[in-house]
């Protein structure tokens, strides 16, 4: 408990510093299509798709996942399975459904809502994924299932989706990054996480350390967007893998 308190106290101080110093130059892009171009620029050297780790072949504005490189098995939608889409790790529904614009006309009706646009276009929350996975995940919440549950839905990609209960367990390779993105989104945009979510993400954050790519990506986003994810940045600094600033 003491260690956990110290961890959050440290992050709180660091987040406060970021809010006061970096918001001055923090900028967002009104058009989601514009932000997708920047996301491609940031992720051009990504080691693979976010959940499954498939290699990505970039062709002009499009990304094509090499499904054989990660043993991915198409579940149902071959068209979307063969293209890269941009996944909101914290789903647009989670940060948008309570807004009046969403209640009046859904996500499309929020395109002129400034506060919504800031959140939707935050590069820290966008990851390149196989399109079919993006569609299947939808706005389902992350969870942890028993090991014997829902195996093999996507071949060797260990993404598990419980469509009935609208829950998803991502592969281990993405759990740490997911936890740190959620904590960032919660702090930066003042979204309250449930006790269950906090417990799960604390476990993932502790168990799965930052990767070199996470640190590189955080630096690239900083150069474009003007702010770090403190939950990534602090660990990178500790590991001496983030040399920016």
From Swiss-Prot:
Gene Ontology molecular functions: deoxyribonuclease I activity
EC number: 3.1.21.1
Keyword set, alphabetical order: Endonuclease, Hydrolase, Nuclease
Gene coding for it: endA
Function per UniProt: Has double-strand break activity.
Coiled-coil stretches: none
SUPFAM superfamilies, alphabetized: His-Me finger endonucleases (SSF54060)
Recorded catalytic activity of this chain's protein: Endonucleolytic cleavage to 5'-phosphodinucleotide and 5'-phosphooligonucleotide end-products
One Pfam short name: Endonuclease_1
Protein family per UniProt: Belongs to the EndA/NucM nuclease family.
Organism: Buchnera aphidicola subsp. Baizongia pistaciae (strain Bp)
UniProt protein name: Endonuclease-1
Nucleotide-binding keyword on record: no
InterPro entries, per database record: Endonuclease-I, His-Me_finger_sf
């Amino acid at each position: 408990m003491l260690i956990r308190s110290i961890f959050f106290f440290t992050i709180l101080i660091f987040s406060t510093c970021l809010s006061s110093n970096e918001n001055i130059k923090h900028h967002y892009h009104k058009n989601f299509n514009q932000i997708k171009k920047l996301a491609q620029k940031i992720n051009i050297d990504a080691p693979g798709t976010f959940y499954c780790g498939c290699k990505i072949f970039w062709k002009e504005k499009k990304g094509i996942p090499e499904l054989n490189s990660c043993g991915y098995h198409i579940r149902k939608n071959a068209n979307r399975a063969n293209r890269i889409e941009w996944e909101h790790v914290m789903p647009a529904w989670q940060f948008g459904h309570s807004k009046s614009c969403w209640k009046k006309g859904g996500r499309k009706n929020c395109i002129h809502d400034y506060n919504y646009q800031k959140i939707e276009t935050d590069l820290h929350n966008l990851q390149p994924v196989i399109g079919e996975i993006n569609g299947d995940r939808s706005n389902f919440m992350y969870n942890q299932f028993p090991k014997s549950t829902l195996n093999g839905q996507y071949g060797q990609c260990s993404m598990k989706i419980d469509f009935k209960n609208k829950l998803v367990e991502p592969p281990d390779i993405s759990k740490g990054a997911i936890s740190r993105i959620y904590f960032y989104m919660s702090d930066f945009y003042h979204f309250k996480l449930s006790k269950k979510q906090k417990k799960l993400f604390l476990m993932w954050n502790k168990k799965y350390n930052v990767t070199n790519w996470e640190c590189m990506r955080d630096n690239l986003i900083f150069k474009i967007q003007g702010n770090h994810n403190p939950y990534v940045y602090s660990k990178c600094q500790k590991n001496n893998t983030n040399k920016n600033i």
